[in-house]
Amino acid sequence: EAIVAEFEADLSGEDLRVIAIDLRAKINDGVVVLFSKGQERATLVAAVGAAAKSGGVKAGEIVKTASVLLGGGGGGKDDFAQGGGNNQELIGDAVKEIKKFLESVK
């Protein structure tokens, strides 16, 4: 199971982390990718549960892929990663790309 969502509110990376980890636990260790549109920058986090990790999904790879699209960078571990970029207008494209990737690994 996966949740990929965008918040219009300017949430911090820490806010997104708390929400993502809580949601990951509620969807039985699935994948949660959250984006936030800030005043000047887009922020994203990915939280990946054990079952999804064993299926080849890695949070760091998700964040790197999306961050490049957003004109920035990021990374982390297999279970949690954080990043962002300055091209907030491309969040929709990043969401589509992540959904397509997650469909391909099901």
Please place each PLM-identified region on the residue numbering.
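Glycine-rich, acidic loop segments that terminate in or are immediately followed by a histidine
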Residues: 2-106
